[in-house]
Amino acid sequence: AITFEEEEEALKISNDVEYGLTGYIWTNNVTRALRFSDELEAGMIWVNSENVRHLPTPFGGIKSSGIGRDGGDWSFEFYMEQKHIGFATGNHQIPKLGK
């Protein structure tokens, strides 16, 4: 086990690695879990659980663990280019600037 005195030290130890696929937080303090998970450099984080993954959720890491996410609907974005197309379906007035 790696020991630490303060939460900041635990976060520094956790983030001071080359990889960032997943992280685990064990605590009874929900506020601490939310704060720590926000700062933890990992693509997937479990709180009081060990690698129980719902398959449609995104899978992937950061740093040397890779970029992007795979799994579920998140996979599609890797293989596609998004484009916005807006259609006016009614007869509407286009405002004239300066009038």
Regions found by a protein language model. Name each.
Residues 1-99:
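Conserved C-terminal structural/oligomerization subdomain of aldehyde/semialdehyde dehydrogenase
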